[in-house]
Structures are given as structure tokens and as C-alpha cells.
Amino acid sequence: NKFTKIFKKIYYKVFIENFNGKLNYDFPNNFYRWDLIEYLIKKNNYTNYLEIGCDQNQLFSKVLIENKIGVDPVSGGNIRKTSDDFFKENVDKFDIVFIDGLHTYKQVKKDILNSVNFLNKNGIILVHDCMPDSLGKQAVPRYKMQWNGDVWKAIVDLRQKENLDIYTCEMDQG
């Protein structure tokens, strides 16, 4: 609605531009996470992809890259275990990591910090579900079908770390 759009513009101006300088990515309305990942892979010649939380492979199946690993304890991907167990055993490095696993602050923060340890130089970590648009979508524990959880708290918290550059894209639930 109109109020939400105005609020988001003001929020962006006050909290994002004032802290980080103006970043302008005019994503088209039909630009989704798989489009962004494909763009980054091609632009940076990435060859190694990790996805945490694959569900039914909605994204994992669309990512075309030389080496890809998908970790999910229930379905999707190609490794059936929790992200914590995966990172304990992993020795591979990745160019691009997409995190869409358990949507809780504590777990997402662990997934991000673990991913940083296995990121190639000039690599990037993308985190989904950072911009819930209602209290119900961010409630923990989950009680709605559509759920972002409190992922956003990990983003706010990790912005305080000096060695990480963190940006939020207003697209596909952030």
C-alpha cells in the first residue's frame, strides 16, 4: 500500500543511506533471488556455490554453476544434514553462499559466521528473509505459513562487525 512504500523510502533514507552511502539497485519487480544469484555468478565468474536450506529445490535447481552443494536436513539439495554438522566436516571453499535455512536469529548468525570461514576471497554471502512485512511473519516460534522468522536480527547484529560489509536488498523478502 501507499503508506508502506513511503515508510520504506523514509527508512532507507534515514537508516541505510546515512550509514552506508547511497546504494541504488533498481531491481525490476519480477527480479528474484535466482536472478540475483545468476547475475553474481556470471559477473564474478564464480564456480563454487553453497546453499543452506534447500527445501524442495525451488532455488537450488535453478542455480547453474560448476560446483554446487545444497545442505538441508529434510529435503532438497544434495547433502542431508544440518548446517552445523555440515560445517564441522566441510573442507571446501565457496564463492557464493545462499542462506535460507532455519529462520531464527541464533541459527542464521551461526550460518553466516560459519560461511565466512569457508568463503573464497571476493566471495559473497546472501541471506534470504531479512525483511518481514508483519509481526506475524517474524514471530518465533513460527505460527504462520509464510514466515521470515527473526533473521533480520542477525543482520542488525552483524552490521556491528567491522570486517563484514552488509547490505539489504529490497527484493524477494529481503
Segments predicted by a language model, with ranges:
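A short alpha-helical cap/connector motif
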Residues: 1-98, 102-174
